[in-house]
Amino acid sequence: MLDKKFHVKKGDTVSVIAGKDKSKTGKVIRILPKKDGVLVEGLNMVKRHMRARGNEPGGIVEKENPLHVSNVMLYCDKCKKPVRSKMNVLEDGKKVRVCIKCGDSFDK
C-alpha cells in the first residue's frame, strides 16, 4: 500500500512551474502515485503511434504525458497565480486546503 500524500487532487486547477509547458494552467485528470506524477488536461502532450485494434483505427494519437508532482502548483482563482497551500482544520474537524496568500479554500 502506498502512503504518499500529494498537494494536488483530481479536479484541481494547477499551473506548471517547470518544463516545456511552464506557466500554463490546466485541470488534473489523474494522479499517478507510483510514478509521483499527475496528468494535466491538455498539457505535456506527446504523439503515440497506435496499432489498429478491433474496430479502432490505427494512426498517430496525441495524449497527455505525466508531469512530476513537484513541477506543478495549485492555481488560485482569487489570486490569479500559482500558490502554495496549507491545511486548516474547521470547527467540525474537517481538514481543508487553503491558499497561503488570500486564505481562499481549494476544497469546496
Curated annotation (Swiss-Prot):
Transmembrane segments: none
CDD domains: KOW_RPL26 (cd06089)
Key words of the record: Ribonucleoprotein, Ribosomal protein, RNA-binding, rRNA-binding
GO molecular function annotations of the record: rRNA binding; structural constituent of ribosome
Any Gene Ontology CC annotation: ribonucleoprotein complex
Gene3D superfamilies to which the protein is assigned, alphabetical: 2.30.30.30
InterPro entries reported for this sequence: KOW, Rib_uL2_dom2, Ribosomal_uL24, Ribosomal_uL24_KOW, Translation_prot_SH3-like_sf
GO biological process, one term: translation
HAMAP family for the chain: Ribosomal_uL24_B (MF_01326_B)
Record's subunit section: Part of the 50S ribosomal subunit.
Family stated for the protein in its record: Belongs to the universal ribosomal protein uL24 family.
Function according to Swiss-Prot or TrEMBL: One of two assembly initiator proteins, it binds directly to the 5'-end of the 23S rRNA, where it nucleates assembly of the 50S subunit. One of the proteins that surrounds the polypeptide exit tunnel on the outside of the subunit.
Name the UniProt record assigns to this protein: Large ribosomal subunit protein uL24
Organism the protein comes from: Geobacter metallireducens (strain ATCC 53774 / DSM 7210 / GS-15)
Gene: rplX
